Amino acid sequence: MNPLTRVALAVAAFAALVLALSACGPAHVAGHVPKRRDYAVPDAAGQEAQVASAGSTWREGRAASMLYTDARALRENDLVVVRIEEIADAKRSADTDLTRRSELNASIEAFLTSLDTPYALKGGATTGFKGLGSTARTERLTATVPAVVRKVLPNGNLFIEGHRVVLVNAEEQHFYISGVVRPIDIDQENGVKSSMVADAEIEFTGRGVLSDNQRQGWLSRLLGWFWPF
C-alpha cells in the first residue's frame, strides 16, 4: 500500500468518526449544560403534608384514584406547560428648574463728606440650573415552555423547572423557567400562565452568529472604558 493510499484511508476514517460522534446527540453552537435550580422553601414552619390514614379507601397513586380526576400535574416528574407572556412597560421623567438671585447695595457718602462725587458699592449674583430627563422602556416575551415538577412542597404547591433549546440556522435560542405554582392555577389543558408562577426565574438567551454580531467587540469595549468623553 503506497503512502498516498494510507493518507486517504486515514482521512476517510477520521471523517467517519466525526460523523458518528456528531450523530450521537444534538449539535449545539457551544458547550451547553442545562441549568438546575436548587430551590429551598423559604419557611416550612407550620406546613405539614396531608397524609391519608392507613385505613383510608382513597390512596394516592392507585389506578382507581385517577378515574374521576383530570390529568393535571400533581406529582414529581409530571409535565406542565408554561405559557410565558411577560410585558414590561416603564416610563420615567424628571424636570428640575432652580434659580437663585442675590443683590447688595452699599453707600459710603457719609464717610467721604469732603468729596462731591458719591461713592457706592453694588454687587449682584444670579445662578440657575435647569435639567430635563426622561426614559422609556418596553419589553415583551412570549413563549411556550414545557416544565417538569421537580418537587412537591409540604403545602401542596409545585416547584417546576423547564428548558427549551431551539436551533435555527446556526443560531441557538435557550428558554428557561422555574418557580412555584399552585395546582389550582393549572387549567384543564395542563397549562399555567407565567404570571401565576411565584419566585419565577425566566431567562431567554441566544448564542450564534446573530448574537455575536450584536455584541460589541473587545477592543471597542476597552476603548470605551478608557475614553473619558
UniProtKB/Swiss-Prot annotation:
Keyword Signal applies: yes
GO molecular function: cytoskeletal motor activity
Major subcellular site: membrane
S-diacylglycerol cysteine lipid sites: 24
Sorted UniProt keywords: Bacterial flagellum, Cell outer membrane, Lipoprotein, Membrane, Palmitate, Signal
Subcellular localization, as worded in the UniProt entry: Cell outer membrane; Bacterial flagellum basal body
InterPro entries from the UniProt entry: Flag_Lring (IPR000527)
Keyword Lipoprotein: yes
Coiled coil residues, start to end: none
Bilayer topology term: Lipid-anchor
Signal peptide segment: 1-23
A Gene Ontology cellular-component term: cell outer membrane
Protein's GO biological process: bacterial-type flagellum-dependent cell motility
Residues bearing a lipid moiety (N-palmitoyl cysteine): 24
Similarity remark: Belongs to the FlgH family.
UniProt-listed PANTHER family: FLAGELLAR L-RING PROTEIN
Function: Assembles around the rod to form the L-ring and probably protects the motor/basal body from shearing forces during rotation.
Subunit structure, interactors included: The basal body constitutes a major portion of the flagellar organelle and consists of four rings (L,P,S, and M) mounted on a central rod.
Name of the protein described by the UniProt record: Flagellar L-ring protein
Organism field: Anaeromyxobacter dehalogenans (strain 2CP-1 / ATCC BAA-258)
Gene: flgH
